[in-house]
Swiss-Prot record:
Organism: Halobacterium salinarum (strain ATCC 700922 / JCM 11081 / NRC-1) (Halobacterium halobium)
Task performed by this protein: Acts as a chaperone.
CDD domains: ASKHA_NBD_HSP70_DnaK-like (cd10234)
Entry keywords, A to Z: ATP-binding, Chaperone, Nucleotide-binding
The protein's name in its UniProt record: Chaperone protein DnaK
Length: 629
């Protein structure tokens, strides 16, 4: 194993996955629960923050304190969620998920993991990318690279392909949709074009089923289940299960007993949904994938006949409706040799291997998904970097003032494809001052855009006459200062210590309860072989362990000590029982005049039980051309 690993992380809307290079191949890491994916869910329950499967398992009973699909809000200004008495930004919620991923990876690998490559939807804008990077830093990662999800998936796919080819990656996840076209060959992964919809994903198919079920129920009973948070959570889980079942079956039944109650008593929900009905109520959603796919082909200057292979990414691509649409759009059946839930994490691990030196001869050439520029006179959007430009990249353009004696300008940075600046996404703004007074049109102000390999933008403006310059690294309204990140890291670390204490307490309790069960079982099985004194010692040791367990907040050390003493006592049962068996067999053998009694050695009870019980789930420029009015 290399001395340093760079973790590949697919931070998904619905589920997350993580992987690392093992030799020449990327390998998915199983989490603490033994699963290959981790639900992207955080909840607050009884003073604790739960992450992943434990959070998902309690969602029905605790919907108001359960947060899912936070990825859809990454980079949103002033957006927070309440858990317990605290408010959390999307970055902080995502950091909790990443913190669990980091801890589980370290446990799996047996070493610290400080560095990560984290993926984002290809159509994420700069603010969303910066927010993702902030989340990684809050979780304690040194984020080595932000990589587009379809690009990462192509890297996982391309490891087994030697030929040059053009690949279309169709990525429909839980909350976002991306389509990218890449040229693969000679170890180079070059993105030709990308497009997508950041507000379209498997969650929307779930919501369509929820509305279908709720509308039918309301028509029959006059009750809108969507107004009851607990009933809505049950509907949400049932809708997701129905969607999954309808990917392999023609019909499924949704059965929710006691979903609500009236004055007459409890009311149950039981409805059949056919695949035909499901596809009918989601037809508008599948149609929304057509435009971005066709636009990506157009931007790449390709027709569907130029595509050699189609890769499906994201669990939502398992729906037959989606696969049929892709085949119709591209004219060929998609590849099925890439696991849609794992491909992105595997590709991120490959990129991590490239950065760490574990993987040679691979070059990733990604693109910026949207055009970047500034606002100029009249509110127009002046592009400096066009969409689908390979990154990292730099572009400059010279502007001037629009008023006499103008001594400052405002640079407003936008990202998007609309011609009117205000219709695009405002990423940030700053002022350049100290421009010597001069007639309009005289000053020469050079604006330079630089996009790094993570797709994060830096903008600089310099007055060429005076040499005055100002710059900004775009973080948007949701960007975090170093001080904020440090504070959140400290907060995350504090929770990590609490989590570790809870982990130890749970493990100690599990081992104690298992030891008691084993002791009682051994006493019963060996009742005739154990003398009264030893039986009394064992019962006393059991009582000591149980006494600690019965405390409101058992001391971990005390519980571990009592359990160890009980285990030591149990060894005596094995020894005593074994010795008595040997004595009995020796006597029998002596009477028979032979060695036949030796066969009994296979049945010694001393080592039959395992003290390790199963772990329970861990709770763990207005820059005009330039014009100042």
């Amino acid at each position: 194993m290399a001395s340093e690993k760079i973790l590949g992380v697919d931070l998904g809307t619905t589920n997350s996955a993580f992987a690392v290079m093992e030799g020449s191949d990327p390998e998915i890491i199983t989490n603490e629960e033994g699963d290959r994916t981790t639900p992207s869910i955080v909840a607050h329950d009884d003073g604790e923050l739960l992450v992943g499967k434990p959070a998902k398992n309690q969602a029905v009973q605790n919907p108001d304190q359960t947060i899912a699909s936070i990825k859809r809000h990454m980079g949103e200004e002033d957006y927070t969620v309440a858990l317990g008495d605290d408010e959390y930004t999307p970055e902080e919620i995502s950091a909790r998920i990443l913190q669990k991923i980091k801890r589980d990876a370290e446990e799996y690998l047996g070493q610290d993991v400080e560095k990560a490559v984290i993926t984002v939807p290809a159509y994420f804008n700069d603010r969303q990318r910066q927010a993702t990077k902030d989340a990684g830093e809050i979780a304690g990662f040194d984020v080595e690279r932000i990589v587009n999800e379809p690009t990462a998936a192509s890297m996982a796919y391309g490891l087994d392909e030697d030929r040059d080819q053009t690949v279309l990656v169709y990525d429909l996840g839980g909350g976002t949709f991306d389509v990218s076209i890449l040229d693969l060959g000679g170890g180079v992964y070059e993105v030709a074009a990308t497009n997508g919809d950041n507000d379209l994903g498997g969650d929307d198919w779930d919501h369509a089923i929820i509305d279908h079920l709720a509308d039918n129920f309301e028509n029959e009973h006059g009750i809108d289940l969507r107004e009851d948070r607990q009933a809505l959570q049950r509907l949400t889980e049932a809708a997701e299960e129905a969607k999954i079942e309808l990917s392999s079956r023609k019909e499924t039944t949704v059965n929710l007993p006691f979903v609500t109650a009236t004055d007459s008593g409890p009311v149950h929900l039981e409805q059949d949904i056919t695949r035909a009905t499901f596809e009918s109520i989601t037809e508008d959603l599948i149609e929304r994938t057509v435009g971005p796919t066709e636009q990506a082909l157009e931007d790449a200057g390709l027709s569907k006949s130029d595509i050699d292979d189609v890769i499906l990414v994201g669990g939502s691509t398992r729906m037959p409706q989606v696969q049929a649409q892709v085949e119709d759009l591209v004219g060929q059946e998609p590849k099925k040799n890439v696991n849609p839930d794992e491909a992105v994490a595997l590709g991120a691990a490959v990129q991590g291997g490239v950065l760490s030196g574990e993987v040679d001869d691979i070059v990733l050439v990604d693109v910026t998904p949207l055009s970047l520029g500034i606002e100029v006179k009249g509110g127009l959007f002046e592009r400096l970097i066009e969409k689908n430009t390979a990154i990292p990249t730099t572009a400059s353009k010279v502007f001037t003032t629009a008023a006499d004696n103008q001594t400052s300008v405002q640079i407003r940075v936008f990202q998007g494809e609309r011609e009117i600046a205000s219709e695009n996404e405002l990423l940030g703004d700053f002022h350049l001052t100290g421009i010597p007074p001069a007639p309009a049109g005289t000053p020469q102000i050079e604006v330079t855009f630089e996009i790094d390999a993570d797709g994060i933008v830096n903008v600089e403006a310099e007055d060429q006459g005076s040499g005055n310059a100002e710059s900004i690294t775009i973080e948007g309204g949701a960007g975090l200062s170093d001080e904020q990140i440090d504070e959140m890291q400290e907060d995350a670390e504090a929770h990590a210590e609490e989590d570790e204490q809870r982990r130890r307490r749970i493990e100690a309790r599990n081992e104690a309860e298992t030891a008691i069960q084993r002791a009682e079982s051994l006493l019963e099985e060996n009742e005739e072989l154990v003398d009264e004194d030893l039986e009394a010692d064992v019962n006393d040791a059991i009582d000591d362990v149980q006494a600690v367990l019965d405390e409101d907040e058992p001391e971990i050390d005390a519980l571990e000590t009592a359990t160890e003493e009980l285990s030591d006592t149990l060894q005596e049962i094995g020894k005593q029982a074994y010795q008595q068996q040997q004595d009995a067999q020796a006597g029998a053998a002596g009477g028979a005049g032979g060695m036949g009694g030796m066969g009994g050695m296979a049945d010694g009870p001393g080592g039959a039980a395992d003290a390790d019980g199963d772990d329970e789930e861990y709770v763990d420029a207005d820059f005009e051309d330039v014009d100042e009015e």
